[in-house]
Amino acid sequence: MVTLTVGTTMMASCSKDNSDEPEQKMVNGTDVNPRNVFPLGLPKKISEIVLTLNEKGQLVQFSEPNSNDRATFEYKDVALGSTQAPQVILTETDEPDKHVYELYLNQDGFVTHAKETHYSNDHIIGKATWDFAYNADNQLKDVKCSTDKKHIVLEYQNGNVVKTTTTTVGKPTEVTTITYATASTRPIENKTGVMLFATTLDADFDNLEVAYYAGLLGKPSKNLPLQSEKSGDKATFKWTLDGNGNPTVLNYSFSNLSENFRFPFTW
């Protein structure tokens, strides 16, 4: 699947800078747009994954060249806040498997509920539901999945996620702390809106993370994370920025792994 987790390639986009455009009032699913989350526009490319936008600037597909793995978005003419029908359909395909998500959005255009159907060879093999909640700043703070009763809580301080707690039936509780300044590095402003939930925050909500890049999972953190720690294992994130403050490379490593990881961004 096209995901944003360690050991996978990431996504890219064909986008323009919408920072000077006024934010338009959203009424229904056809109005949602990533510019409401990414003030400088989406990056053109991150690693090898391409984000394709339609003429309205909406994300319509994630796809990696020469691969059948893809995620597509379909926007519906359904009023925001309605629970009668989904405003967006997200389909993630990795043949022979396919996950279809019916996304229900609140008045701000963010997902609050999702119905997932898992197909294999066109036969339904599983279903799940997801629920999302946001804080007063419209940042994602709570994720629940019916599968294994998974529950992720994101705690914020000064506009940043400083702790994530994940509970799953039959598994130990996982707690990760995140820091945004070190002895040698000051906080880095997150000017572009980039969020890597699974990789940098240890908040793993499976295939649905791609919905963030469609502008559907809330507002970004104030700063870019520099370190995280879980059960004594530490991760270090080193960002390279261009003159406009856009991240051009994320290099990161884990204390319990010898391998280093690198995600380039093209703007």
Which functions belong to the PLM regions below?
Residues 10-13:
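C-terminal motif of bacterial Sec signal peptides marking the signal peptidase cleavage site
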Residues 1-5:
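Sec-dependent N-terminal signal peptides
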